[in-house]
Amino acid sequence: MSAATTRLRLRVSPGNGRAEIVGRHGDAWKVRVTAPPEQGRANDAVVRLLADTFALPLSAVAIVSGHSARDKIIELTGVGPALIERRLASASSVDRGRKDRRT
């Protein structure tokens, strides 16, 4: 049996103060990375952020389209869509802010 492969839409904001998953942005997820959008550094930072979030090797995260755009399609190998949604929701700063206000 082959590993699950799932595509994910992202809206990337490069050159920020910290790398984080912000929350939903329409049908995509908004992420921020500290790297500038120069020479693929922001793309590399996006791949690292997602690999860390899902505990995947870097080779399991690939940018399928949008290499030079803010809107990207990412392919994740080894994780299904339901788990992706749960992990992104729990990792998002918007969700963390809601949890902080409830306590």
Where are these regions (language model features)?
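Contiguous, often N-terminal, cationic amphipathic patches that form binding interfaces
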Residues: 1-48, 53-58, 62-103
